[in-house]
């Protein structure tokens, strides 16, 4: 009304934080974004327990490696040995009553963009990328969830990248024995690249397409430690 030009530096891309769950809309519309599990918590046993079928992954130490025995649980139940038993862990629902989402899961970032940015496009139209200059993302992360960070296709991607099955060395992510340094390096490389490919690249591509400068910050005070 006063003939003034007002530029908005950036929009906030989330209901609260961390970015990615769209205030609960992403988990509500895409249950697989959270209900597949995000971590693997383990416990050791000197005898395979009778409830071993409750675990997602059961390993038996043999020499310097670990063998998956999920298909042989009846054979080893009650048998002494060194067993590593893994259960899936999940994000909690403190985010406005909704779970955070697995940014490593295929399609989650695209769903977030669809829900959040399409809403902004409907509201602001051509002002998005002109009057509104950028987008701020707040603490998107893939932090540990009571154990080893994991996503359903992680083992397959890891083996394609490094040529060996991570499950045969999984305990070395928390125990310092054998070739643990190489295993941890490879694990973090795969984990970080998945985060780049499945979160950062789709967000960057969208912002570039819409002439938006993308800024913000990751969970630097708590991840990846």
Predicted features along the sequence, with ranges:
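Aromatic-lined carbohydrate-recognition surfaces of secreted/lumenal glycan-active proteins
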Residues: 2-13, 131-139, 187-225
């Amino acid at each position: 009304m006063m003939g003034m030009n007002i530029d908005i530096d950036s929009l906030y891309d989330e209901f609260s934080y961390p970015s990615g769950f769209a205030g609960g809309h992403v988990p509500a519309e895409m249950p697989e974004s959270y209900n597949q599990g995000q971590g693997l918590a383990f416990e050791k046993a000197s005898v395979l327990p009778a409830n071993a079928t409750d675990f997602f992954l059961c390993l038996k130490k043999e020499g310097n490696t670990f063998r998956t025995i999920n298909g042989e649980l009846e054979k080893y139940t009650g048998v002494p040995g060194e067993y590593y038993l893994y259960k899936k862990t999940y994000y909690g629902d403190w985010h406005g009553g909704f779970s955070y989402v697995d940014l490593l899961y295929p399609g989650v970032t695209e769903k977030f963009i669809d829900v959040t940015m399409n809403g902004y496009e409907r509201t602001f139209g051509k002002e998005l990328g002109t009057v509104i200059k950028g987008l701020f993302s707040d603490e998107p992360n893939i932090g540990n969830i009571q154990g080893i960070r994991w996503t359903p296709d992680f083992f397959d991607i890891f083996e394609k990248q490094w040529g060996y099955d991570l499950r045969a060395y999984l305990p070395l992510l928390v125990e310092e024995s054998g070739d643990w340094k190489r295993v941890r390096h490879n694990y973090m490389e795969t984990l970080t690249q998945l985060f780049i490919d499945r979160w950062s690249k789709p967000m960057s591509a969208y912002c570039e397409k819409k002439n938006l400068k993308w800024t913000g910050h990751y969970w630097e005070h708590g991840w990846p430690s």
